[in-house]
Amino acid sequence: MKKISLFVYDFDGTLVDTFEDIANSVNRTLIEMNLQSLGPETIRQNIGSGVVNLMTHCLAGSGCNNIETAVSLFRKDYNHHLLDQTKLYPNGREIVEHFSNKKNTILSNKPIAFIEKILEAMNFLPSFDSILGGDSLDEQKPNPKGLQFLMKKYNCPAEKVLMIGDNAIDVETGKHAGVITCGVTYGLGDTNSLRDSKPNFLIDNLSDLKSLFN
Protein backbone atom coordinates (compact mmCIF):
# COMPACT_ATOMS: atom_id res chain seq x y z
CA MET A 1 0.00 0.00 0.00
CA LYS A 2 1.19 3.47 -0.86
CA LYS A 3 1.17 6.22 1.76
CA ILE A 4 -0.74 9.34 0.72
CA SER A 5 -0.96 12.61 2.67
CA LEU A 6 -3.06 14.71 0.29
CA PHE A 7 -6.13 13.41 -1.54
CA VAL A 8 -7.31 15.65 -4.40
CA TYR A 9 -10.71 14.70 -5.81
CA ASP A 10 -12.40 15.91 -8.95
CA PHE A 11 -16.08 16.73 -8.31
CA ASP A 12 -18.52 16.04 -11.18
CA GLY A 13 -18.32 12.39 -12.16
CA THR A 14 -15.94 11.47 -9.35
CA LEU A 15 -17.49 12.28 -5.97
CA VAL A 16 -20.92 13.42 -7.09
CA ASP A 17 -23.22 12.34 -9.92
CA THR A 18 -24.42 15.69 -11.23
CA PHE A 19 -25.13 14.63 -14.81
CA GLU A 20 -28.93 14.76 -14.95
CA ASP A 21 -29.14 18.21 -13.42
CA ILE A 22 -26.40 19.62 -15.66
CA ALA A 23 -27.94 18.09 -18.80
CA ASN A 24 -31.41 19.37 -17.95
CA SER A 25 -30.10 22.88 -17.31
CA VAL A 26 -28.18 22.84 -20.59
CA ASN A 27 -31.31 21.89 -22.51
CA ARG A 28 -33.52 24.42 -20.72
CA THR A 29 -30.92 27.05 -21.64
CA LEU A 30 -30.89 25.99 -25.29
CA ILE A 31 -34.69 26.01 -25.47
CA GLU A 32 -34.79 29.48 -23.87
CA MET A 33 -32.43 30.62 -26.65
CA ASN A 34 -34.78 29.08 -29.25
CA LEU A 35 -32.27 26.36 -30.06
CA GLN A 36 -32.69 22.61 -30.32
CA SER A 37 -32.08 20.51 -27.24
CA LEU A 38 -29.28 17.96 -27.23
CA GLY A 39 -29.11 14.27 -26.44
CA PRO A 40 -27.55 13.21 -23.15
CA GLU A 41 -24.36 11.77 -24.66
CA THR A 42 -23.58 14.98 -26.55
CA ILE A 43 -23.77 16.88 -23.28
CA ARG A 44 -21.96 14.23 -21.27
CA GLN A 45 -18.84 14.31 -23.42
CA ASN A 46 -18.46 18.05 -22.84
CA ILE A 47 -18.67 18.05 -19.03
CA GLY A 48 -15.44 18.52 -17.11
CA SER A 49 -13.82 21.52 -18.75
CA GLY A 50 -15.87 24.25 -17.08
CA VAL A 51 -19.11 26.08 -17.89
CA VAL A 52 -17.75 28.21 -20.73
CA ASN A 53 -16.34 25.20 -22.58
CA LEU A 54 -19.51 23.22 -21.89
CA MET A 55 -21.79 25.83 -23.43
CA THR A 56 -19.37 26.60 -26.26
CA HIS A 57 -19.46 22.97 -27.36
CA CYS A 58 -23.21 22.70 -26.84
CA LEU A 59 -23.78 25.69 -29.14
CA ALA A 60 -21.48 24.30 -31.83
CA GLY A 61 -23.36 23.76 -35.08
CA SER A 62 -26.43 25.65 -33.87
CA GLY A 63 -25.65 28.80 -35.83
CA CYS A 64 -25.57 30.75 -32.57
CA ASN A 65 -22.32 31.98 -31.10
CA ASN A 66 -23.67 33.99 -28.18
CA ILE A 67 -21.60 32.12 -25.61
CA GLU A 68 -21.86 34.84 -22.98
CA THR A 69 -25.67 34.70 -22.95
CA ALA A 70 -25.67 30.90 -22.92
CA VAL A 71 -23.28 30.79 -19.96
CA SER A 72 -25.30 33.38 -18.04
CA LEU A 73 -28.60 31.60 -18.65
CA PHE A 74 -27.11 28.23 -17.75
CA ARG A 75 -25.66 29.51 -14.48
CA LYS A 76 -28.98 31.10 -13.51
CA ASP A 77 -30.98 27.97 -14.31
CA TYR A 78 -28.54 25.47 -12.82
CA ASN A 79 -28.31 27.46 -9.59
CA HIS A 80 -32.00 26.64 -9.01
CA HIS A 81 -31.66 22.95 -9.92
CA LEU A 82 -28.40 21.89 -8.27
CA LEU A 83 -29.98 19.09 -6.27
CA ASP A 84 -32.98 17.90 -8.27
CA GLN A 85 -31.36 14.53 -9.03
CA THR A 86 -27.75 15.02 -7.96
CA LYS A 87 -26.39 12.42 -5.55
CA LEU A 88 -23.13 11.11 -4.15
CA TYR A 89 -21.57 8.15 -5.91
CA PRO A 90 -21.49 4.90 -3.91
CA ASN A 91 -18.95 5.03 -1.07
CA GLY A 92 -18.13 8.69 -1.72
CA ARG A 93 -18.85 9.84 1.81
CA GLU A 94 -17.41 6.68 3.34
CA ILE A 95 -14.05 6.94 1.57
CA VAL A 96 -13.52 10.57 2.53
CA GLU A 97 -14.37 9.71 6.14
CA HIS A 98 -12.03 6.69 5.98
CA PHE A 99 -9.15 9.01 5.11
CA SER A 100 -10.23 11.76 7.50
CA ASN A 101 -6.76 11.75 9.09
CA LYS A 102 -5.37 12.96 5.73
CA LYS A 103 -5.96 16.19 3.84
CA ASN A 104 -9.07 15.77 1.70
CA THR A 105 -9.53 18.38 -1.02
CA ILE A 106 -11.47 19.05 -4.22
CA LEU A 107 -10.05 20.44 -7.46
CA SER A 108 -12.74 21.01 -10.07
CA ASN A 109 -13.43 23.18 -13.11
CA LYS A 110 -16.97 23.73 -11.77
CA PRO A 111 -17.72 27.17 -10.26
CA ILE A 112 -16.94 26.95 -6.57
CA ALA A 113 -20.31 28.37 -5.46
CA PHE A 114 -22.10 25.40 -7.06
CA ILE A 115 -19.74 22.91 -5.42
CA GLU A 116 -20.17 24.43 -1.97
CA LYS A 117 -23.96 24.63 -2.25
CA ILE A 118 -24.22 20.97 -3.26
CA LEU A 119 -21.87 19.77 -0.52
CA GLU A 120 -23.58 21.93 2.10
CA ALA A 121 -26.98 20.50 1.21
CA MET A 122 -25.51 17.00 1.52
CA ASN A 123 -23.92 17.88 4.89
CA PHE A 124 -20.58 16.97 3.33
CA LEU A 125 -18.86 20.36 3.15
CA PRO A 126 -17.04 20.11 6.53
CA SER A 127 -15.30 16.91 5.38
CA PHE A 128 -13.00 18.83 3.02
CA ASP A 129 -9.96 20.83 4.03
CA SER A 130 -9.87 22.88 0.81
CA ILE A 131 -11.99 23.31 -2.30
CA LEU A 132 -10.83 24.91 -5.54
CA GLY A 133 -13.36 25.51 -8.29
CA GLY A 134 -12.92 26.61 -11.86
CA ASP A 135 -13.12 30.25 -10.82
CA SER A 136 -10.88 30.02 -7.74
CA LEU A 137 -7.65 30.73 -9.64
CA ASP A 138 -6.79 32.19 -13.02
CA GLU A 139 -6.19 28.74 -14.56
CA GLN A 140 -8.28 25.57 -14.81
CA LYS A 141 -7.39 21.91 -15.23
CA PRO A 142 -5.45 20.52 -17.07
CA ASN A 143 -3.20 23.41 -16.02
CA PRO A 144 -1.59 22.15 -12.77
CA LYS A 145 -1.73 25.52 -10.99
CA GLY A 146 -4.59 24.50 -8.68
CA LEU A 147 -2.95 21.22 -7.79
CA GLN A 148 0.37 22.93 -7.15
CA PHE A 149 -1.43 25.48 -4.97
CA LEU A 150 -2.80 22.67 -2.78
CA MET A 151 0.58 20.93 -2.62
CA LYS A 152 2.24 24.14 -1.48
CA LYS A 153 -0.55 24.95 1.00
CA TYR A 154 -0.13 21.62 2.76
CA ASN A 155 3.62 21.37 2.16
CA CYS A 156 3.12 18.01 0.53
CA PRO A 157 5.64 16.41 -1.88
CA ALA A 158 4.37 15.02 -5.17
CA GLU A 159 4.95 11.39 -4.17
CA LYS A 160 2.46 11.81 -1.29
CA VAL A 161 -0.30 13.37 -3.42
CA LEU A 162 -3.12 11.48 -5.17
CA MET A 163 -5.23 13.08 -7.92
CA ILE A 164 -8.51 11.20 -8.43
CA GLY A 165 -10.84 11.80 -11.36
CA ASP A 166 -13.10 10.37 -14.05
CA ASN A 167 -11.66 12.35 -16.94
CA ALA A 168 -8.41 12.27 -18.88
CA ILE A 169 -8.12 15.96 -17.95
CA ASP A 170 -7.68 14.96 -14.31
CA VAL A 171 -4.91 12.51 -15.16
CA GLU A 172 -3.21 15.09 -17.36
CA THR A 173 -3.39 17.63 -14.53
CA GLY A 174 -1.82 15.18 -12.12
CA LYS A 175 0.95 14.28 -14.52
CA HIS A 176 1.76 17.95 -15.11
CA ALA A 177 2.29 18.29 -11.36
CA GLY A 178 4.17 14.99 -11.05
CA VAL A 179 1.71 13.43 -8.59
CA ILE A 180 0.16 9.97 -8.44
CA THR A 181 -2.99 9.65 -10.54
CA CYS A 182 -6.06 7.45 -10.15
CA GLY A 183 -8.85 7.22 -12.70
CA VAL A 184 -12.40 6.15 -11.84
CA THR A 185 -14.33 4.26 -14.50
CA TYR A 186 -17.89 4.89 -13.26
CA GLY A 187 -18.05 8.63 -13.92
CA LEU A 188 -18.93 11.00 -16.74
CA GLY A 189 -15.63 10.90 -18.60
CA ASP A 190 -15.00 8.69 -21.62
CA THR A 191 -13.50 5.47 -20.27
CA ASN A 192 -11.35 4.81 -23.34
CA SER A 193 -9.84 8.29 -23.16
CA LEU A 194 -9.30 7.79 -19.44
CA ARG A 195 -7.45 4.51 -20.04
CA ASP A 196 -5.42 6.06 -22.84
CA SER A 197 -4.27 8.82 -20.47
CA LYS A 198 -2.53 6.06 -18.49
CA PRO A 199 -3.26 6.88 -14.85
CA ASN A 200 -1.11 5.13 -12.27
CA PHE A 201 -4.23 3.41 -10.94
CA LEU A 202 -7.68 2.71 -12.37
CA ILE A 203 -10.59 1.79 -10.10
CA ASP A 204 -14.26 0.91 -10.54
CA ASN A 205 -15.43 2.06 -7.11
CA LEU A 206 -14.12 4.64 -4.66
CA SER A 207 -13.97 1.96 -1.97
CA ASP A 208 -11.05 0.44 -3.92
CA LEU A 209 -8.88 3.28 -2.62
CA LYS A 210 -8.81 1.60 0.80
CA SER A 211 -6.83 -1.37 -0.50
CA LEU A 212 -4.39 0.76 -2.50
CA PHE A 213 -3.48 3.63 -0.19
CA ASN A 214 -3.00 4.43 3.46
Give the positions of each predicted feature.
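Short helix-capping segments at alpha-helix termini
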Residues: 31-36, 62-66, 123-127, 155-156
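Short, acidic loop-to-helix structural element flanking the phosphoryl-transfer center
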Residues: 4, 80-106, 112-116, 144
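Helix-loop "lid/cap" segments that line or gate small-molecule binding pockets
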Residues: 29-30, 50-64, 118, 150-151
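Active-site neighborhood of HAD-like aspartate-dependent phosphohydrolases
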Residues: 1-45
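Asp-based, Mg2+/Mn2+-dependent phosphohydrolase catalytic module
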Residues: 1-5, 116-214
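Metal-dependent phosphoesterase signature
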Residues: 56-97
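An amphipathic alpha-helix signature
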Residues: 23, 27, 40, 44, ...
